[in-house]
Amino acid sequence: MIGLSHYLTVAAILFTLGVLGIFINRKNIIVILMSVELILLAVNINLVAFSAYLGDIVGQVFALFVLTVAAAEAAIGLAILVVFFRNRGSIAVEDVNMMKG
């Protein structure tokens, strides 16, 4: 049977991959956004696993809220990225500091 430790191990691996993705690839904004999504997915797995383990639904409801915030964050981030690419022709992180405003 799959226990709590299995879910926590998968979540720890996903969290580590997300953090490594941010630290290793600092040049591409898309990879950074995907790494942030991996981190949020790991948090959601932890919330749902502990919620099921404790028999409480609060963790699952909170995971649903985290999913909606993550979807909004991804949509806004990609929209900003598309506008930035149309204006600059590049999605390099070094060019982001040249934004006006």
From Swiss-Prot:
<feature type="transmembrane region" description="Helical">
    <location>
        <begin position="65"/>
        <end position="85"/>
    </location>
</feature>
<dbReference type="InterPro" id="IPR001133">
    <property type="entry name" value="NADH_UbQ_OxRdtase_chain4L/K"/>
</dbReference>
<dbReference type="GO" id="GO:0005886">
    <property type="term" value="C:plasma membrane"/>
</dbReference>
<feature type="transmembrane region" description="Helical">
    <location>
        <begin position="4"/>
        <end position="24"/>
    </location>
</feature>
<feature type="transmembrane region" description="Helical">
    <location>
        <begin position="29"/>
        <end position="49"/>
    </location>
</feature>
<keyword id="KW-0812">Transmembrane</keyword>
<comment type="function">
    <text>NDH-1 shuttles electrons from NADH, via FMN and iron-sulfur (Fe-S) centers, to quinones in the respiratory chain. The immediate electron acceptor for the enzyme in this species is believed to be ubiquinone. Couples the redox reaction to proton translocation (for every two electrons transferred, four hydrogen ions are translocated across the cytoplasmic membrane), and thus conserves the redox energy in a proton gradient.</text>
</comment>
<keyword id="KW-1003">Cell membrane</keyword>
<keyword id="KW-0874">Quinone</keyword>
<dbReference type="GO" id="GO:0030964">
    <property type="term" value="C:NADH dehydrogenase complex"/>
</dbReference>
<keyword id="KW-0813">Transport</keyword>
<keyword id="KW-0472">Membrane</keyword>
<dbReference type="GO" id="GO:0048038">
    <property type="term" value="F:quinone binding"/>
</dbReference>
<dbReference type="Pfam" id="PF00420">
    <property type="entry name" value="Oxidored_q2"/>
</dbReference>
<keyword id="KW-1278">Translocase</keyword>
<keyword id="KW-1133">Transmembrane helix</keyword>
<keyword id="KW-0830">Ubiquinone</keyword>
<comment type="similarity">
    <text>Belongs to the complex I subunit 4L family.</text>
</comment>
<comment type="subunit">
    <text>NDH-1 is composed of 14 different subunits. Subunits NuoA, H, J, K, L, M, N constitute the membrane sector of the complex.</text>
</comment>
<dbReference type="GO" id="GO:0042773">
    <property type="term" value="P:ATP synthesis coupled electron transport"/>
</dbReference>
<dbReference type="InterPro" id="IPR039428">
    <property type="entry name" value="NUOK/Mnh_C1-like"/>
</dbReference>
<keyword id="KW-0520">NAD</keyword>
<keyword id="KW-0997">Cell inner membrane</keyword>
<dbReference type="GO" id="GO:0050136">
    <property type="term" value="F:NADH:ubiquinone reductase (non-electrogenic) activity"/>
</dbReference>
<protein>
    <recommendedName>
        <fullName>NADH-quinone oxidoreductase subunit K</fullName>
        <ecNumber>7.1.1.-</ecNumber>
    </recommendedName>
</protein>
